[in-house]
Design a protein with these regions (language model features):
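Conserved nucleotide-sugar phosphate-binding/catalytic loop shared by glycosyltransferases and other
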Residues: 29-75, 79
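A short, histidine- and acid-enriched strand-loop-helix "catalytic/donor-clamping" loop
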Residues: 117-131, 143-145
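N-terminal subdomain of nucleotide-sugar transferases
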Residues: 1-39
Length: 254
């Protein structure tokens, strides 16, 4: 039986790692699933853990008021040392481009434990945009043995960097699995459905979306906080406008 340790610390990571945790837990005869959270985001992380009923085996709880990247990196690195020595996993899975991911991958490397990188291969090829995420994911990619790329483009990025094709797997993005789970939860829970419809109305959306049997399709769009202003935001708005004009039967909600 293989020991699989999944390490994450922020809300986005938790959202995308939750389906993997559930999948591994359903194969208890093949895998021992170990969940380690760093608490890089504390309250926002805990929201997702409650949603998926995930109870971490280890919690580094590194969050401190006024912490910076130096603090996060150092606390994750030293915290993971003790966790890895105790748990002795066969593989460490990290996600994306956070400081938690990079520091955890580095800690696993120091312990000579192979790393799998979920959502691998995203690149802008500018280490300062986004910062520090672009460098984080490049470093993590250099450490990782297995690369789980969401798209063919991500795979090509890794191939261009010299990663062995046999170690790259196009998996899609696990956020879609999370989306299906949440939609199913909302449909089965009248209280949650009512709360969502209230929030939609308060945001100016006129339709009680989940209450309608016959309804228009809706596309919900979110953006990284750094793209919510300046040129990035303008480009997002232009793209939404193009899509809205092309697909008039769909409502695009940003």
């Amino acid at each position: 039986m293989k020991k699989i340790m999944l390490v994450f610390g922020t809300r986005p990571e938790a959202i995308k790692m939750a389906p993997l945790i559930k999948a591994f837990q359903q194969k208890k005869n093949k895998f021992e699933t170990i969940v380690c959270v760093t608490g890089q985001h504390r309250e926002m992380l805990d929201q997702v853990l409650r949603l998926f009923n995930i109870r971490p085996d280890y919690d580094l709880n590194i969050m401190r008021q006024g912490q910076d990247l130096y603090d996060v990196t150092a606390r994750v690195l030293t915290g993971m040392r003790d966790v890895l020595q105790e748990a002795k996993p066969d593989i460490v899975l990290v996600h994306g481009d956070t400081t938690t991911s990079t520091a955890a991958a580095l800690a696993a490397f120091y312990g000579q434990i192979p790393v799998g990188h979920v959502e691998a291969g995203l690149r802008t090829h500018n280490i300062y945009s986004p910062w520090p995420e672009e460098m984080n994911r490049q470093i993590t990619g250099r450490i990782a043995t297995w690369h789980f790329a969401p798209t063919a483009l991500s795979r090509n990025n890794l191939l261009q960097e010299g990663v062995d094709a046999d170690n790259i797997h196009i998996t899609g993005n696990t956020v879609i699995d999370t989306l299906y789970h949440v939609v199913s939860t909302i449909r089965e829970n009248p209280t949650l459905r009512q709360q969502l419809n209230i929030q939609l109305r308060s945001a100016g959306y006129k339709t009680a979306y989940f209450a309608e049997q016959s309804r228009r399709k809706m596309v919900l769009i979110t953006g990284h906080r750094r793209e919510n202003f300046g040129d990035g935001f303008i480009q997002i708005c232009q793209a939404i406008k193009t899509l809205a004009e092309r697909y008039t039967e769909v409502d695009f909600v940003y």
